[in-house]
């Protein structure tokens, strides 16, 4: 039986004294896309940020419970957060390319690791941009500013930047919500093509998107994980009334 690559156990997250995530437990499996759905403020993005310790610099954030990655406690004092975020990369809601060339955006993390060899960097750029399904669109513009690209292209460059550090897990926080439908569709195709190599957690507002590309879905409400399971089963036969009401649009 396949072992989970990531396990969240009884995880609670607090902002000051407000409990944003309440005793959540989930297992995530290799080479699957897991969609996280639910109304705004239900805890989906909080979970992503807890997984790769994005809350470390915010003194108002505290948490209890455990996050285990490949059997290691993410919150152990021995965990190197820089290395952790290379293993567990993140793509945000708004495309956030750096104000530099497409090439330098993609190799940014590699340069931080001290990699200077031109052939290595060139190969990483081509491989990562192909993985993000944007190589053909930018191969003649590698040294132009990434800020000159369309929003959808910028987001795929951000995905390529994440791929360049060779993560095992990619966290995606509503990566298509700021994009037009055509650009969003290209991102979905990209994610589907990456599934053989990566494990992905996707926060999405779109029920159609969740049903199209995810293997499992977790439904959150008011910081609670209401239901978690196979996507097709959940959408066809939800076990909880709250889940059914949400995915059928009775509230959102």
UniProtKB/Swiss-Prot annotation:
Recorded GO CC terms: plasma membrane
Residues noted as binding ATP in the record, renumbered to the chain: 38-45
Domain ABC transporter: 6-247
Cited Gene3D superfamilies: P-loop containing nucleotide triphosphate hydrolases (3.40.50.300)
Cross-referenced Pfam families: ABC_tran (PF00005)
SUPFAM superfamilies for this protein: P-loop containing nucleoside triphosphate hydrolases
Catalysis: reaction(s): phosphate(out) + ATP + H2O = ADP + 2 phosphate(in) + H(+)
Main localisation: membrane
Subcellular location: Cell membrane
EC numbers on record: 7.3.2.1
CDD domains the record matches: ABC_PstB_phosphate_transporter
Annotated PROSITE patterns: ABC_TRANSPORTER_1, ABC_TRANSPORTER_2, PSTB
Gene Ontology BP term (one): phosphate ion transmembrane transport
Molecular-function annotations in GO: ATP binding; ATP hydrolysis activity; ATPase-coupled phosphate ion transmembrane transporter activity
UniProt entry keywords in alphabetical sequence: ATP-binding, Cell membrane, Membrane, Nucleotide-binding, Phosphate transport, Translocase, Transport
Bilayer topology term: Peripheral membrane protein
InterPro entries in the cross-refs: AAA+_ATPase (IPR003593), ABC_transporter-like_ATP-bd (IPR003439), ABC_transporter-like_CS (IPR017871), P-loop_NTPase (IPR027417), PstB-like (IPR005670)
Family: Belongs to the ABC transporter superfamily. Phosphate importer (TC 3.A.1.7) family.
Quaternary structure note: The complex is composed of two ATP-binding proteins (PstB), two transmembrane proteins (PstC and PstA) and a solute-binding protein (PstS).
Function summary: Part of the ABC transporter complex PstSACB involved in phosphate import. Responsible for energy coupling to the transport system.
Record-given protein name: Phosphate import ATP-binding protein PstB 1
Species this protein is from: Streptococcus agalactiae serotype V (strain ATCC BAA-611 / 2603 V/R)
Gene name, Swiss-Prot/TrEMBL: pstB1
């Amino acid at each position: 039986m396949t072992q989970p690559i990531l396990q969240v156990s009884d995880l609670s997250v607090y902002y000051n004294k407000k409990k944003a995530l309440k005793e959540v437990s989930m297992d995530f499996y290799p080479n699957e896309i897991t969609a996280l759905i639910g109304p705004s403020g239900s805890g989906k993005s909080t979970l992503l940020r807890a997984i790769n310790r994005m809350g470390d610099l915010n003194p108002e954030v505290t948490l209890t419970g455990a996050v285990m990655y490949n059997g290691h406690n993410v919150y152990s004092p021995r965990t190197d957060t820089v290395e952790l975020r290379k293993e567990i990369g993140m793509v945000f809601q708004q495309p956030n390319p750096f104000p530099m060339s497409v090439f330098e955006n993609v190799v940014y993390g590699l340069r931080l690791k001290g990699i200077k060899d031109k052939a290595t960097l060139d190969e990483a750029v081509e491989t990562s941009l192909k993985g993000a399904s944007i190589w053909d669109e930018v191969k003649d513009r590698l040294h132009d500013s990434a800020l000159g690209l369309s929003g959808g292209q910028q987001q795929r460059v951000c995905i390529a930047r994440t791929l360049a550090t060779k993560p095992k897990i990619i966290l995606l926080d509503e990566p298509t919500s700021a994009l037009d439908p055509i650009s969003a569709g290209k991102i979905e195709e990209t994610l589907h093509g990456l599934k053989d190599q990566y494990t992905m957690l996707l926060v999405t507002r779109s029920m159609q998107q969740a049903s199209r590309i995810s293997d499992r879905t977790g439904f959150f409400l008011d910081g609670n994980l209401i239901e978690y399971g196979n996507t097709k089963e959940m959408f066809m036969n939800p076990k909880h009334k709250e889940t059914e009401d949400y995915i059928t649009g009775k509230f959102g």
